[in-house]
A protein has these predicted regions:
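N-terminal Rossmann-like NAD(P)+-binding domain of SDR-like oxidoreductases, especially those catalyzing
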Residues: 1-177
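Conserved donor-binding loops in enzymes that form glycosidic bonds
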Residues: 11, 32, 56, 80, ...
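C-terminal substrate-binding subdomain of Rossmann-fold SDR/epimerase-dehydratase oxidoreductases
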Residues: 196-307
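NAD(P)-dependent short-chain dehydrogenase/reductase
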Residues: 127-130, 134, 148, 152-212, ...
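Residue-level signature of the cytosolic catalytic core of signaling kinases
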Residues: 59, 129, 142, 150, ...
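Short, surface-exposed alpha-helical segments at coil->helix boundaries
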Residues: 38-41, 155, 190, 247, ...
Length: 307
């Protein structure tokens, strides 16, 4: 299979590239390297053969021409949604990438587009709903904040292009993904590991009792790879269904790094857009992607710290 990965030099994208190459697919990476790094693709480049890397803006005419030349079976879009407090241009950029990819897919006859978006943005604030959150149909989504609206709009674009141009899609609502190659500023797990391994005090927003659904990157990539061939027309939760508090997460990471348990966490004010509790149920993923998470949190954190 011929696959294009938008954002393939990033944290999750580079792991997806490794997975696709290991299954003998041909992969073209399109990445502007604004947040990604060629170092993330060192293993993939060593494999050689089926990989080509293109330092391009995904919205450029050059990227469109490349997609037209390659005519991939699947395009994976792994772009980063900015925090809600970022300037409007940053949010517009995220939508421009999805729209540009869909337009290229329409023009060049691409069969399927897979987009991953943060579940925390897409599902809003589940204050009165039972956790873990069940899968919902796209029309039932009620996102909150600018980031959530952008995530929802990305999924709406997929639906529109499927209805108008018969371009198949699968949208994955991803839990909080962690693992090797994660940047220190790429989320709470990366920040805590950086603090622990550099003997610096971790910073916790609020009291640390807020919870997240933590998904190891290999598990996330397995779902992405499966979505390339399954789950057409669906929005699918990809998570563990298990809540872990931010405070407990720090304690688990600190226990893996000598001396880190002696570090005293610094508590800052709670963020205005902070979710109090969050976890998602992957029932639809089990049914339609034949996927379930398999990496225990302690095992995943150990691999991250030791790797």
């Amino acid at each position: 299979m011929n696959v294009v990965v938008i954002g393939g030099a990033g944290f999750i994208g580079s792991h997806l590239v490794d997975r696709l190459l290991s299954h003998d697919h041909t992969v073209d990476v399109i990445d502007d390297l604004s947040t990604g790094s060629l170092a993330n693709l060192a293993d993939a480049r060593a494999v050689g053969g089926g990989l080509k890397i293109h330092h391009l803006d995904a919205t450029s005419t050059e990227a469109d021409s490349l997609i037209g030349m390659r005519r991939p079976d699947v395009i994976h879009v792994l772009t980063t949604l900015p925090p809600s407090d970022q300037p409007p241009a940053a949010h517009a950029r995220a939508l421009q990438v999805v729209l540009a990819v869909l337009e290229a897919a329409r023009r060049h006859g691409v069969g399927k587009v897979v987009v991953a978006v943060p579940a925390t943005a897409l599902h809003g604030h589940p204050t009165s709903r039972a956790l873990p959150l069940k899968d919902v149909d796209i029309g039932q989504l009620v996102p909150r904040g600018v980031r959530g609206v952008v995530a929802r709009a990305s999924v709406d674009l997929l639906v529109a292009f499927r209805d108008l141009h018969a371009i198949e899609f699968t949208a994955l609502a991803m839990a909080t993904v962690y693992g090797p190659r994660q940047r220190a500023d790429g989320g709470v797990v990366g920040a805590f590991v950086h603090a622990a391994t550099n003997a610096s005090a971790p910073v916790i927003d609020g009291d640390g009792r807020q919870t997240r659904d933590l998904l190891y990157v290999d598990d996330a990539v397995d779902a992405l790879a499966r979505a390339g061939e399954r789950g057409g027309g669906l929005l699918v939760n990809v998570g563990t269904g298990v809540q872990t508090s931010v405070g407990e997460l720090w304690n688990r990471i600190a226990a893996l790094v000598p001396g880190a348990s002696d570090l005293l966490a610094l508590h800052g004010p709670a963020r205005s857009d902070e979710l109090a509790r969050f976890a998602i149920s992957p029932v639809r993923a089990r049914i339609h992607l034949a996927w379930s998470p398999w990496t225990d949190l302690d095992d995943g954190l150990t691999r991250l710290v030791e790797g």
